[in-house]
């Protein structure tokens, strides 16, 4: 009740402030974002040595209310909301509110392009860059839906770039200081050719109980060739990139290690059916995964957010269908098969449904 009253007071203050300014006008927008997620992992064929069999089955609702004020050159906005998630089969609704959403956004349009800055607790969906699953796995994208920090974006006719800061933890007795810097960009060189990059630097510092610092960095410059323009195909593309990593446990190693490799992704898309193959060739991009900090706590998924199979040769095949149901409804049904140098590891079946209903409200 207290949180709800605070939110109402904040919006009332913003509305009153805008009305007091000459020409001030607040545009209100109510948004409801619903996400249904089903992901069934079957890895018994490999003895669940790398990934365990299991199912993630959840429904997410993100209601938000936004207010925008038109300035001289910039549109200023404030958004308040909540991230609600229910895990199917759970016997309690107490954990339904997962995280609050509160962020400021400023958008400026120029002749060269559009710049947008965001600060606060904002949804990951505001980011538009491309990142390999070596950076973020499909499960991580679902479970870590919001960032706490800032986001900067620039879009021009043939160029896009973004940079984000996610402050994930403040140092305490048993709490680590953690923050992540992420960036991506795309340059449309020609109709069928684009160049780009993805970058991630993760600072995983120690707590008072377990001092020490671990640095994890990953950079992927890439190029993409898409032969679909001018044909009946939606996509006929080949993307190739070099994965360059930087790993350093400062308390246990005198110098960092720099394992790396190459990644190639081929995609065919027609009639909203996608067939995609991804192959990675190279070294172990997760060398500290099985390591522990000075208190004996494993690094594991606390240090690496990408797919677990990037420890050597890795091949993944995806087949999925994304039918067009409505403008605001997206459905995805698919299956993925995973191979490493040890052979067949397992497969997964996924269903995702997203309904994003944005409703402008009458301005004051």
Residues covered by each model-derived region:
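A generic beta-sheet turn/junction motif
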Residues: 23, 56, 67-73, 110-114, ...
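Exposed, low-structure sequence patches enriched in small/polar residues
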Residues: 33, 156, 160-162, 168, ...
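Positively charged n-region of N-terminal signal peptides that target proteins for export
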Residues: 1-4, 18-19
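Surface-exposed coil loops of outer-membrane beta-barrel proteins
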Residues: 116-186, 201-203
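Outer-membrane beta-barrel proteins
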Residues: 20-22, 49-53, 92-96, 107, ...
């Amino acid at each position: 009740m207290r949180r709800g009253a605070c939110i109402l007071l904040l919006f009332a203050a913003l509305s009153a402030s805008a009305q007091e300014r000459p020409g001030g006008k607040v545009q209100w927008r109510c948004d409801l974002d619903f996400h249904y997620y089903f992901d069934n992992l079957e890895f018994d064929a490999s003895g669940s040595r790398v990934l365990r069999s299991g199912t993630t089955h959840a429904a997410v609702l993100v209601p938000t209310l936004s207010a925008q004020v038109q300035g001289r050159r910039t549109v200023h906005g404030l958004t308040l909301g909540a991230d609600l998630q229910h895990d199917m089969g759970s016997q309690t609704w107490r954990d339904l509110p997962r995280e609050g959403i509160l962020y400021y956004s400023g958008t400026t349009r120029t002749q060269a392009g559009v710049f947008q800055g965001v600060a606060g607790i904002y949804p990951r969906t505001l980011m538009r860059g491309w990142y390999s699953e070596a950076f973020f796995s499909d499960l991580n994208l679902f479970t870590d839906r919001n960032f706490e920090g800032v986001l900067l974006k620039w879009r021009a006719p043939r160029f896009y770039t973004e940079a984000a800061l996610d402050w994930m933890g403040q140092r305490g007795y048993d709490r680590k200081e953690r923050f992540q810097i992420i960036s991506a960009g795309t340059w449309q060189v020609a109709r069928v050719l684009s160049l780009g990059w993805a970058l991630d630097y993760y600072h995983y510092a120690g707590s008072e109980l377990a001092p020490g610092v671990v640095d994890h960095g990953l950079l992927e410059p890439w190029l993409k060739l898409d032969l679909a323009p001018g044909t009946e195909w939606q996509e006929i593309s080949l993307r190739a990139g070099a994965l360059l990593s930087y790993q350093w446990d400062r308390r246990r190693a005198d110098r960092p290690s720099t394992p790396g490799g190459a990644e190639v992704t081929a995609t065919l898309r027609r009639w909203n059916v996608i067939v995609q193959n991804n192959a990675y060739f190279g070294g172990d991009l997760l060398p500290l995964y099985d390591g522990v900090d000075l208190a004996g706590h494993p690094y594991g998924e606390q240090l690496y957010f990408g797919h677990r199979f990037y420890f050597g040769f890795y091949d993944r095949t995806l087949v999925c269908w994304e039918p067009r149901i409505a403008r605001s409804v997206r459905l995805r049904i698919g299956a993925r098969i995973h191979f490493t140098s040890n052979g067949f590891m397992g497969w997964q079946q996924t269903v995702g449904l997203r309904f994003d209903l944005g409703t402008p409200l009458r301005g004051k």
